[in-house]
């Protein structure tokens, strides 16, 4: 089985916590910075880069189980079913985990750290308003 030969993804930050920011591609840099800034403010937030999509890397279910909330940060539309972008929808379907939510944006520009943290704060109930320029599903 090819999936079993892939390396397990490595969590950036604490191995468990309140929120896990999952990312792939060009969103990973801003996610790393968001994790660093969030942790410097005392938040239990970590990041996880996804490097393989088909098949998905092994161990995702076990990693996700250690976090209260999973946010998939991607430059993508929120999708037909409103779960977030395409990766969030795939992860929800494959892992059968309704804690997975998307933090999406479709204006063609990279995420700003404040957008990621603003949306994460909103989804975690810390802020009554989410960051402008990015969608939440």
Which positions does each model-derived feature cover?
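Short helix-loop-beta junction
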Residues: 1, 33-47, 94-98
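Short glycine/threonine-rich loop-to-helix capping motif typified by GTGT followed
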Residues: 33-36, 55-65
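Glycine-/acidic-rich phosphate or pyrophosphate-binding loops and their flanking alpha/beta elements
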Residues: 1-19, 32
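Peripheral docking tails and interdomain loops at the edges
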Residues: 75-137
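Short acidic loop-to-helix transition motifs that present clustered carboxylates
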Residues: 50-58, 109
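C-terminal substrate/ligand-recognition segments
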Residues: 20-31, 38
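Solvent-exposed alpha-helices and their adjacent loops that cap or buttress functional pockets
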Residues: 11-15, 62-65, 93
């Amino acid at each position: 089985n090819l999936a079993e030969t892939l390396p397990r993804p490595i969590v950036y930050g604490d191995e468990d916590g309140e929120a896990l920011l999952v990312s792939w591609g060009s969103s990973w840099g801003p996610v790393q910075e968001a994790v660093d800034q969030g942790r410097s403010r005392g938040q239990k937030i970590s990041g996880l880069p996804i490097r393989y999509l088909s098949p998905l890397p092994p161990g995702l279910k076990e990693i996700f189980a250690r976090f209260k909330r999973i946010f998939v940060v991607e430059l993508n539309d929120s999708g037909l079913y409103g779960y977030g972008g395409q990766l969030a929808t795939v992860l929800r379907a494959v892992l059968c985990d309704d804690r997975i939510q998307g933090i999406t944006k479709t204006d063609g520009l990279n995420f700003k750290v404040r957008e990621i943290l603003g949306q994460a704060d909103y989804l975690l109930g810390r802020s009554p308003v989410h960051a402008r320029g990015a969608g939440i599903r």
